[in-house]
Amino acid sequence: MAAQGFLLNASFLLILLVLAKPLGSGLARLIAAVPLPGVAGVERILWRTLGITDHEMNWRQYLLALLTLNLLGLGILFCLLFWQEWLPLNPQRLPGLSWDLALNTAVSFVTNTNWQAYSGESTLSYFSQMAGLTVQNFLSAATGIAVVFALIRAFTRQNVHTLGNAWQDLVRITLWILFPVALIIALFFIQQGVPQNLSAYQPITTLEGAKQLLPMGPVASQEAIKMLGTNGGGFFNANSSHPFENPTVLTNLAQMLAIFLIPAALCFAFGEAAGDRRQGRALLWAMSFIFVVCVAVVMWAEVQGNPHLLAAGADSSVNMEGKETRFGVLASSLFAVVTTAASCGAVNAMHDSFTALGGMVPMWLMQIGEVVFGGVGSGLYGMLLFVLLAVFIAGLMIGRTPEYLGKKIDVHEMKMTALAILVTPMLVLLGSALAMMTDAGRSAMLNPGPHGFSEVLYAVSSAANNNGSAFAGLSANSPFWNCLLAFCMFVGRFGVIIPVMAIAGSLVSKKVQPASQGTLATHGALFIGLLIGTVLLVGALTFIPALALGPVAEHFSLP
């Protein structure tokens, strides 16, 4: 079993690197605002048609453009969901959503979280899925990538005040990266058996003679961008454990690769844009090390078997509860780590049914800020925040002004870095405390004791860090939970983006200083170790007390 797990993980990472490197080169061209081959003429027509100028923006203008797009999208999506019953492509005549569920869902998809307090096949029409959710899957992913583009330009430019044109970046990211790659993935899914139609649900008679209604819909097109954009919201309630979303082991592998593809490619793009590919590889090594360790822990925990079944004398060589037999325990464990290391949230197994330690690792990966590969764009700019913190700590230890890529890191950058890093822990801890202190929060818990607390902690961690996965034993479709999690999702997204853009605006105006003899090398093993230590230290100091009350306490209470 250990050898199988090693081969699965190694082959996954190898294929990922082979696919990510060429995509990284394309992303680097977009960061440099160089049109991809053969599309310059198309872009000129688009700019004229859409009224987009070549005027570059400072950080406030860039941020305002992104906020305008996202707030407009939030309002439109809320209206689509609230008045769903009056809109076309609703063959099942599904009613509109309640105001609180519509608000929660709209915020969820605009913020790239895709938390779902509803069952897709019994709640949303095809029009809501296509014109609402799928569109936001593209736009929220493009927003995250645009933010990291601006931050990378801040490191590579000097003595200027502009970070690019947000509208051009969004169009280029969507048309030349997200759409073509998602199209290829969608066609592969269709070939593997994922539905792509607008048919009404199909009544069938099972082999036992029972009547059943099979859900249909444009699944493949939404499934592709759901994974590529690290969105994670499933067309069906069972998400990627549903055979219509993830029918084969090949689609399962493709989905995991799609989740990590752009985050890994952005590391290569960062190195190329910075003029030193070692810088991007250093970040990739740090992410990969934490990822591999987490995969090993989850696989080890899940192959130990279910302690409750073992105590009852039943055969439980591995913990298969909540897992699909077509994937098995190892692929399910790998998927769980992939989807929570990235801010995706799609699941091919029920995380609530993992062992205490097996479920704690995905929760902790979210809590450290989704920086281990992370979401498209958000993962890299989150890791770069930890890079700034690491060079600041190193500067304190050796008595030098911290700098990264020749840019001196001053008080303003460190204040913004601290603010961005502390936003999500505050939301998680205060939100979980509020839920446990109120009757409205506790009434949603379906399990008592440490596991019930773990479900609450997981839900708020998932929302605040824009992941979207859940421990399913929580009845979260209530006004209290819909509003609490919507607030956490919104602040967790834009409460980080705003200080990141402020950092970019400060750094881009600075001069690049030549490296001196005492400059800390930020591409070697020493710095990689320091960066990993910084991520682990912040995560440990912040969340160990909460984890001790949940999964750790549950583990030690097992028979």
UniProtKB/Swiss-Prot annotation:
Pfam families: KdpA. InterPro entries: KdpA (IPR004623). It is a multi-pass membrane protein. The keyword Transmembrane helix applies. One of its GO terms (cellular component) is plasma membrane. Keywords: Cell inner membrane, Cell membrane, Ion transport, Membrane, Potassium, Potassium transport, Transmembrane, Transmembrane helix, Transport. Belongs to the KdpA family. PANTHER family: POTASSIUM-TRANSPORTING ATPASE A CHAIN, POTASSIUM-TRANSPORTING ATPASE POTASSIUM-BINDING SUBUNIT. Part of the high-affinity ATP-driven potassium transport (or Kdp) system, which catalyzes the hydrolysis of ATP coupled with the electrogenic transport of potassium into the cytoplasm. This subunit binds the periplasmic potassium ions and delivers the ions to the membrane domain of KdpB through an intramembrane tunnel. This is Potassium-transporting ATPase potassium-binding subunit. It comes from Salmonella newport (strain SL254). The lineage of its organism: Bacteria, Pseudomonadati, Pseudomonadota, Gammaproteobacteria, Enterobacterales.
